[in-house]
Structure formats: C-alpha cells, structure tokens
C-alpha cells in the first residue's frame, strides 16, 4: 500500500507543501523503487485506517472534547463539501494517470465522509451517492483503461512550481517501459491546486508533440507551435492533454531511372516497356510517383541538375515505338 504516495498528494493538494517539494518526493519514490515495483504499487488516497479522504479534503476540524456521537454524525458544510469534491477529482485523476495500480476505498467514489475507525468504515450510502463525483470516476477510469500509455508509458515530470504540477506519460515506437509491444500514446497531465488563481501556461513540448493536443476531458484542442502549447488552467482543475496529431501511414514506392528498365537493346527506353511498367505499378496500387521532365523546364528546374536530366538523350528513344507511331 503506497502510503508515501498518498501523503505526497494530500500535502500538495491541501497546500502543506509546494510543487517543488512534491516533485522531490515523487522522484525519490521513483528512484528508490525498482521499475517493476514502481509500476505495481498500490496507489491509494483512501483507506480503512485513515480519516475519509472527503473529510480530510474538506478541512474538517475535530475537537478532542467533541462527543463521539457528534463525530459519528459529522458532515461537511456545503461549501466545504464542494471544495473537497473538487480536490478529490484532482487526486482521483492523479491516481488514474500515475504509474502504479490505483486503489479506490469503497465509498470514496460517491463522497462518503467519516473520521477515523470506526467512523471511516460505515455502511455504503445507498440512495445518497454523489452522482456527479461517481461520473467523474467513471470517466477517468475509462480514460485509463483505453490508453496503455497511462498504465505502462514512461513517466517524466515536466513542471512543478507553486500550484502547478505537470507530468507526461508516453509510449513511442510501439514499445512500453518494460520493452513490451504496446499502442503508442502521448499524454500531458496538468494540475492546478489553487482555490482561486488560474494560470496561463506555455509548455515546451518539442519532443512530445508537433501538431495538435486535445484535452480528453473536455475535447478542447490546442495547437502546438514552434514546440510550444499555450493554455489556461482554471483553479482546482486538471487537464489531460493527448497528442492527436494525424499519423501518416508508412508508404512505399519505386524510384528508378528509365534506363534501368529491361530492354532487348541492353538499356531501357521511354517506350512500350516503360508504359507497361507504369500500368503494372498502377494495377499494383502504387500511389507514390516521381515525375521527371523530358525537356528543359528552366535553368534550375531539373531535380537532378541545372539542365534537364533527360533532354537531348537519344538513348532514351525507343525506335520501335517511333516507327509504330509513324514518327
């Protein structure tokens, strides 16, 4: 059970530590665990041994002289509950996009509250579930399940400053961090823990994306220009950017000089054999062509030299074709 992970996240979200300290602590975890362990850690934010995560994130205060009956019945005021829910959305998203195995303590996904044992182990609140919070969990779980890069992709912290924490999850060239075949995917996860301040960010992403990135939570798209993407991160919000730049399929073609075509005279010509070869390429589904001029287009227009590569080359003439064509 990855309690250090839990402590790092809660301290950062509550403002007990800044992003720089959170970065150092996350990297300490990353460096001290073997890769296989780091990617298999049980990443939790709620537990049967701790105060309910909603109660913590709502900053509920407990008085040591408070009667146990009041502790048992305590519920966050509405504004504190709303704050706790927004914060929990951030933590849950962090769980689902971070290396490791996310663990959800029953009831956290529907907003259950409670102080320490036994108040954190109450019956499930059937009929009183927070449906909006539950839908958020369903959404981010679906995002994780649909994208291998969020499970076995590489992990790199891109920025950690003040209220902002950003990392990437990437699978390139069809191979994940364990050297296993996996679907390519590029993601950038951006957190703003501030309760009031929005941030205008310019992210340097030259090695991550060269085209278009899309927030998988809102479908809002961002263009990458000169290796940078500009965006605004609202208070208590998260953005999950996915690279959606169109991927061009690899294609093959044939680059060949006409003289390389077979001929009874030992050298190919621009004649019947060339026409038949072009017909063959078309029937074979070839779609890449290189067209070279047979006359001089201009002083510097040839793809090979300052004068046409073919113009005036009588060796390319097919005399049988000339006779057949009565030329």
Language model segments and positions:
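Alpha-amylase-like alpha-glycosidases and glucanotransferases acting on alpha-linked glucans and related
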Residues: 1-99, 160-162, 257, 300-327
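Short, solvent-exposed turn/loop segments enriched in Gly/Ser/Thr/Pro and often Arg
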Residues: 106-114, 156-157, 290-300
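Solvent-exposed beta-hairpin/edge-strand motifs
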Residues: 205-219
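Carbohydrate-binding surface patches
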Residues: 159-206
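Acidic/aromatic-lined carbohydrate-recognition and catalytic surfaces
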Residues: 236, 249-327
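Conserved, mostly hydrophobic/aromatic
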Residues: 48, 95, 107-109, 140, ...
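C-terminal beta-strand-rich structural cap/linker in extracellular carbohydrate-active enzymes
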Residues: 224-250
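Active-site-proximal helices and loops of the catalytic beta/alpha 8
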Residues: 1-45, 113-139, 143-148, 168-172, ...
């Amino acid at each position: 059970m990855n309690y250090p992970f839990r402590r790092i996240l809660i301290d950062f979200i509550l403002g007990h530590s800044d992003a720089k300290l959170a970065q150092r602590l996350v990297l300490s975890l990353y460096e001290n665990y073997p890769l296989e362990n780091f990617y298999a850690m049980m990443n939790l934010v709620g537990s049967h041994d701790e105060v309910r995560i909603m109660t913590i994130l709502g900053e509920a205060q407990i008085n040591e002289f408070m009667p146990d009956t009041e502790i048992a019945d305590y519920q966050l005021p509405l504004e504190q509950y709303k704050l706790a829910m927004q914060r929990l959305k951030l933590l849950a998203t962090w769980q689902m996009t971070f290396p490791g195995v996310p663990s959800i303590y029953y009831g956290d996904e529907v907003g259950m509250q409670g102080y320490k044992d036994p108040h954190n182990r109450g019956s499930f609140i059937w009929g009183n579930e927070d449906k909006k919070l539950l839908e958020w969990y369903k959404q981010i779980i679906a995002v994780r399940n649909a994208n291998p890069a969020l499970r076995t992709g590489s992990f790199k912290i891109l920025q950690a400053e003040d209220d902002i924490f950003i990392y990437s999850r990437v699978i390139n060239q069809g191979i994940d961090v364990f050297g296993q075949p996996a679907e390519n995917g590029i993601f950038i996860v951006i957190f703003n823990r501030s309760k009031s301040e929005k941030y205008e960010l310019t992210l340097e992403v030259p090695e991550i994306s060269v085209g278009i990135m899309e927030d998988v939570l809102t479908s809002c798209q961002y263009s990458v220009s000169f290796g940078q993407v500009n965006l605004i991160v609202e208070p208590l919000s998260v953005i999950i950017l996915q690279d959606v730049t169109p991927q061009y399929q690899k294609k093959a073609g044939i680059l060949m000089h006409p003289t390389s075509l077979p001929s009874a005279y030992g050298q190919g010509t621009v004649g019947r054999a060339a026409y038949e070869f072009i017909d063959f390429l078309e029937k074979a589904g070839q779609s890449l062509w290189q067209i070279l001029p047979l006359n001089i287009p201009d002083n510097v227009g040839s793809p090979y030299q300052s004068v046409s590569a073919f113009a005036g080359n009588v060796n390319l003439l097919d005399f049988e074709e000339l006779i057949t064509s009565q030329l």
